[in-house]
Amino acid sequence: MRVTLVVLLALFLALQYRLWFGKNSLPDYWRLQQEVSNQKNTNENLERRNQLIYADIEDLREGEDALEERARNELGMVKKDEVFFRLVPDRNP
């Protein structure tokens, strides 16, 4: 009986060691859960960004207003017979 108890105790301790410190232990599992959660958040952010980009692409394909706005803001273009004034702040106030 005593030998069986010692063997069972040794087996229990070996399994506990693997559970807490071995490969695929609980701390590894918790770390991987955190990594999966972080990756899901990153994927959601990228999905939202992609949706915005798709909306911009659709606006550029559909209407001229978005195209004109981009040309004005990003390329500094102006319409024919239109005057553009740039106000530069004074460097020495």
Curated annotation (Swiss-Prot):
Q: Which residues lie on this side of the membrane: Periplasmic?
A: 22-93
Q: Name one GO cellular component term.
A: plasma membrane
Q: Which UniProt keywords apply?
A: Cell cycle, Cell division, Cell inner membrane, Cell membrane, Coiled coil, Membrane, Transmembrane, Transmembrane helix
Q: Which residues lie on this side of the membrane: Cytoplasmic?
A: 1-3
Q: InterPro entries recorded for this chain?
A: Cell_div_FtsB, FtsL/DivIC
Query: What domain of life?
Result: Bacteria
Quick one: where is this thing mainly located?
membrane
| Compartment(s) where it occurs, according to its Swiss-Prot or TrEMBL record | Cell inner membrane
Coiled coil location: 28-75
Q: Which PANTHER family match?
A: CELL DIVISION PROTEIN FTSB
State the family named in the UniProt similarity comment for this chain: Belongs to the FtsB family.
Q: What is this protein called?
A: Cell division protein FtsB
